[in-house]
């Protein structure tokens, strides 16, 4: 699935025209990271999906677009976690370009909370809306932190010009 902003949405492409179409892959506001899409008889799709809030499970999208979750492998572990809020932010970066980020924070914190600014490496990569076993914003927020992660200039998922914009200038246009 192609990257689009912070997500890797479920998509389909017309083999003749090359025109791509995003397909809803989740009952949540954002699709997260969709992969392993396999066509099913009758026009449905089987796929894996994870997000910044939840590890990978299997889903099916029927021919009419109805999404159903088939597995909930980590339900017992996830039930032990406190709820966190997830949101996106957008602001004007260098050259007035749109720059995107995500924020995760404990729900209704009783006091001011410290903030962890989580930055992806690369620099041409992305810290998308996906579950990570290496550096996990959801698990950092679980410890009482607000988490901010920005896809600065050079990040992937925003077009080649945006990704290439920091070539030979890593610190100048972030």
Would you name each region that the model predicts?
Residues 25, 29-174:
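Serine-hydrolase catalytic core recognition
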Residues 2-8, 51-54:
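Short, solvent-exposed loop/turn segments at conserved positions within beta-propeller repeat blades
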Residues 7, 20, 42-43:
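Generic N-terminal initiation segments characterized by hydrophobic and/or small/turn-forming residues
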Residues 14-18, 62-65:
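Short loop/turn segments that connect beta-strands within beta-propeller blades
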Residues 18-26:
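Blade-edge beta-strand/turn elements of extracellular beta-propeller
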Residues 10-12:
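Conserved catalytic/ligand-binding micro-motifs in nucleotide and anionic cofactor chemistry
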């Amino acid at each position: 699935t192609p990257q689009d902003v912070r997500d890797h949405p479920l998509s389909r492409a017309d083999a003749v025209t090359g025109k791509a179409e995003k397909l809803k892959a989740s009952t949540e506001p954002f699709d997260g990271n969709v992969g392993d899409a396999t066509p099913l008889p009758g026009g449905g799709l089987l796929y894996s999906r994870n997000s910044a809030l939840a590890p990978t499970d299997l889903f099916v999208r029927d021919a009419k677009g109805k999404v159903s979750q088939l597995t909930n492998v980590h339900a017992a572990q996830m039930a032990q976690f406190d709820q966190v809020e997830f949101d996106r932010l957008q602001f004007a970066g260098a050259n007035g370009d749109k720059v995107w980020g995500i924020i995760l924070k404990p729900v209704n914190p009783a006091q001011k909370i410290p903030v962890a600014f989580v930055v992806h490496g690369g620099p041409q990569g992305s810290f998308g809306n996906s579950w990570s076993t290496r550096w996990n914003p959801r698990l950092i927020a679980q410890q009482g932190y607000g988490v901010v992660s920005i896809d600065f200039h050079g990040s992937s998922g925003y077009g080649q010009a945006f990704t290439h914009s920091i070539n030979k200038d890593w610190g100048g246009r972030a």
